[in-house]
Amino acid sequence: MSRELIILCQPILVLFLTLFYNSHGYFVSQGSVGIGFNGYFTLTNTTKHTFGQAFENEHVEIKNSSTGVISSFSVNFFFAIVPEHNQQGSHGMTFVISPTRGLPGASSDQYLGIFNKTNNGKASNNVIAIELDIHKDEEFGDIDDNHVGININGLRSVASASAGYYDDKDGSFKKLSLISREVMRLSIVYSQPDQQLNVTLFPAEIPVPPLKPLLSLNRDLSPYLLEKMYLGFTASTGSVGAIHYLMGWLVNGVIEYPRLELSIPVLPPYPKKTSNRTKTVLAVCLTVSVFAAFVASWIGFVFYLRHKKVKEVLEEWEIQYGPHRFAYKELFNATKGFKEKQLLGKGGFGQVYKGTLPGSDAEIAVKRTSHDSRQGMSEFLAEISTIGRLRHPNLVRLLGYCRHKENLYLVYDYMPNGSLDKYLNRSENQERLTWEQRFRIIKDVATALLHLHQEWVQVIIHRDIKPANVLIDNEMNARLGDFGLAKLYDQGFDPETSKVAGTFGYIAPEFLRTGRATTSTDVYAFGLVMLEVVCGRRIIERRAAENEEYLVDWILELWENGKIFDAAEESIRQEQNRGQVELVLKLGVLCSHQAASIRPAMSVVMRILNGVSQLPDNLLDVVRAEKFREWPETSMELLLLDVNTSSSLELTDSSFVSHGR
């Protein structure tokens, strides 16, 4: 995570303009970002009630994928705020660590170009910001109108202090005014071993940060950040204007306090309003310009109607859902014109193509479907509204979308090892999965479902769990994808659906009867996937001219004869694997039980897979029952043994059974 110092000043103005206005250059910007005095970078201009965002084009890998712990880092940047009125600021600016390259849906004024009224304070934001706030907002508990704050997922600071610094000579506190037009430096240092975040503000002419920080937060930041994050800056204005300058910054992957001695510029005051005479001249010029522009626009519009090839209109739902929108030309070039040799697969949903984004080595997968296909606009919106806001290592990451003519496109991270079904329905010469790989894949999918069902702010029902929708990355980790049939609802809400959707064989029996999808219907399909992974067989196979053998029935028959281990694929049937293999087979049969009330919730499934809890000894008697209500009340009180405490939980407890939520 090493960066060199970047000074945004006049000598590199030409270079910076090139990078700034190119989406593949150093910055990706939105809003009122521009170039100000002497070529310095500005986040806002004199426009009221606006915001600006500027993010580095490339992500930084801030978290270790295997340990889940973020690295130590330091950030130093130079800034200045020029207010419209000397004694009154606007709203302020921030340094942001974000899971996305930009913050879609952000608002101006008190929201500082980071959040809006709807998403402010949500744990799913995965955003950490250091605010330089020049407006006291009572709703967010601001201490004054001149302070520095540490914000996690919202605008109510977890720590804040009035602007200033501690003098190294005598330890006295020196006040600073954020709206003084003076260039200042902010140092942000996070030490992972100490789990401490230090923030230090001081005048730019001081070459090294003071020893005592202005703010300190003792907290592990790992739970709030993802593996790949983007660094950026935001600023906003309200009814009072302010120009927020960003002069330069330095990012390091190690803790250090760089000594920086720079020539500090004197910034001009806020532009004054023009006189009435000037306004009259401008009005005349503007009238002429508007007329000329109208004529030119009309000619251009006629030309466009005759020669248009790309239709990209921003609709209201696109602002709401927020993932990055790609230009069609960008995807066209990435997939080499959607050539046949780039095709990864196709089906009723459309086609999936492999591509490489121009200007980078990032490989992507592009799913193309049309409005009139089986997966049309409603499914397209379902996928954007769910996976577009999810960030989890076991879910396929949605990078963005595109609409072109009658086609819809979704852009994902490319999974080089394809889908799980390729390994289960392999050819003779294809490499077989080891038991360790299979068990890891099962746990990865279970972890993803647990996040969807119980850990996110809303409950998400996937509705199409099957091997073809489980993608394998280059480290053989499994990621759940294809949310085209997903439904989401608030925690505790009882969903009603009227349309049966999914893949034949993986649809729970109660879903076929009632059309009502629940988390338990996902558990049913997951149970079948577990069995397929262990057995290396399809859930339904033809054994004779007109006979079909069902995988669950075959495993249950072997279990009844004390031979359930024989159901496993021969290549993994080793004595040292017997315990885990039999556990997964039994758990798979339990999850795919015909009665929804018997199926466990995903939190219980994870406890069993992690060895925290055990299956009850009389589980075979349970799964033999066609309906849970056939069991006597005393027989329903089966025990789920806790390995660590030797205590037990009833099978009917909400911690075990999903209850069809």
From Swiss-Prot:
Family matches, as SMART domains: S_TKc (SM00220)
Compartments, record wording: Cell membrane
Inactivation phenotype: Increased susceptibility to the oomycetes Phytophthora brassicae and Phytophthora capsici but enhanced resistance to the pathogenic bacteria Pseudomonas syringae.
Binding of ATP, residues: L344, G345, K346, G347, G348, F349, G350, Q351, V352, K367
Residue intervals annotated with topology Extracellular: 26-282
Glycosylation sites: N45, N64, N116, N198, N276
Catalysed reactions listed for this entry: L-seryl-[protein] + ATP = O-phospho-L-seryl-[protein] + ADP + H(+); L-threonyl-[protein] + ATP = O-phospho-L-threonyl-[protein] + ADP + H(+)
Listed Pfam families: Lectin_legB, Pkinase
Protein name: L-type lectin-domain containing receptor kinase V.5
Organism of provenance: Arabidopsis thaliana (Mouse-ear cress)
